[in-house]
Amino acid sequence: MEKKFYIGCVADDFTGAGDVASFFVKAGLVTVLYNGIPDDGHTVAEGTQAVVIALKSRTQDRVQAVADSLRAFGWLLQEGARKLYFKYCSTFDSTKEGNIGPVADAVMEKFGYPYTILCPALPVNGRTVEKGKLYVNGVLLEESSMRNHPLTPMRESELGRLIEMQSRYKGISMAGKTKEQWKKEQETLCRQEGHCYLIPDYYEESHGKEIAREFCDITFYTGGSGFAEHVGRLLAEKAMADRDADVDVSGEACGKEEACGKEEAC
């Protein structure tokens, strides 16, 4: 079907959904927020540019979290989403067993996305990723107050290990690697295992913009609300260009035509 809106986001709780919706609005996107998956027959209003669905998958059992998330992402695609975003907390927490990996795995497998990125950071709130490790106000996640959270305890700070504890696929830290190096590693893992995760460092606000531009050609993102704003700004640029020209301007949207060679790239 004809693509109707720029990005569809599934958030793992209502608070996070409200946060990411507000960041999309801040980025300049006309945004609609749903509490739960809309009923059959409901259609996204004309002119909508971003759609956010709030679930309860952060603390659900794994099977239900995956099932609900796939239904939500499927509905977004059916309604015409060009890109997908899985929003989770900036401290990367879910249940003790972990729901982030299973949900992201399932989305990549079901919809055919070879890899995605993990971007939980929100530097303005002290959540940063440096050398592949997640910090809360300068303290490693495992040493922060999240360590003994009653519902979502976090006792590991390295995102590669965190995702591999939950996922069937490996996480690749991009820290200290050239683009040629991490790209080769990603392509090798995807060829051997089918899917993988890339983990960029993100400890300054400017990094979010750089990451969004570097990965403007992928369809499925995962991260916190802060990174969603940077993705949203790129898409808002594209929306403005589309309105002005009504032609294929995908290269303009991310500023690097060679990475985005077709209309849906950005």
Give the label of every model feature segment.
Residues 11, 55-57, 88-90:
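Short glycine-centered, acidic/aromatic-flanked micro-motifs in structured strand/loop junctions
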Residues 23-27, 70, 135, 212-218, ...:
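Short, solvent-exposed amphipathic alpha-helical segments in soluble enzyme
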Residues 216-258, 263-266:
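Acidic, glycine-rich loop-and-beta core segments that form the ion-binding/anion-interacting portion
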